[in-house]
Amino acid sequence: EVDDRGATLTSNEGATIRAKHLVMAAGYASQQFLRKRVAKNRSSYAFITEPIDAQTLGTLKDTMVWESARPYLYMRTTGDGRLLVGGDDDSVDIPARRDALVDRKARKLADKVSKLFPGVPVEPAFAWAGTFAETKDGLPWIGASPEHGRRLLFAMAYGGNGITYSMLGAGLIRALVERRKHSLQALFGFER
């Protein structure tokens, strides 16, 4: 329970915790506490090859590639000479359906790499997929939501920049608790 004086939480064992502020930083699960949908789940695909000798890899041996086309492609080598390739994100949000696409998506990614680097043998040895969330504008949602008041603060940093946004968000959350202005409040807050 959250009101204008603070938050009261009760554990499954019956213990009560009272606080002046509650910070909800529960990853994707935070969405369930908001009526407004602030992020959408998506799926990303990746595979890794068996080791490829350094001569065949050529300049790829020490290169990270990010093709910014949509859908994007990224790849890098591992210490033992494998190619780690990923991308081809889609809007599939059901794990079983996503997992059924893994082999086809890996093949599609491998074909794309082969076209870009025809001299490099690209055969997926192991492929996988994962779910991530992204916001419409690519920015995190950090701060108080109008539906819960200023005592419940959310820190929802999604996507590939989540760790960076979480660090920035920590400073913003602290400023909000201390009732100070913060330069990122308008950019990351629920008022946008």
Language-model regions: role of each:
Residues 7, 82-83, 151-153:
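Hydrophobic residues embedded in beta-strands of well-ordered beta-sheets
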Residues 1-78:
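Flavin-dependent oxidoreductases
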Residues 91-99, 111-192:
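C-terminal catalytic lobe of FAD-dependent flavoproteins
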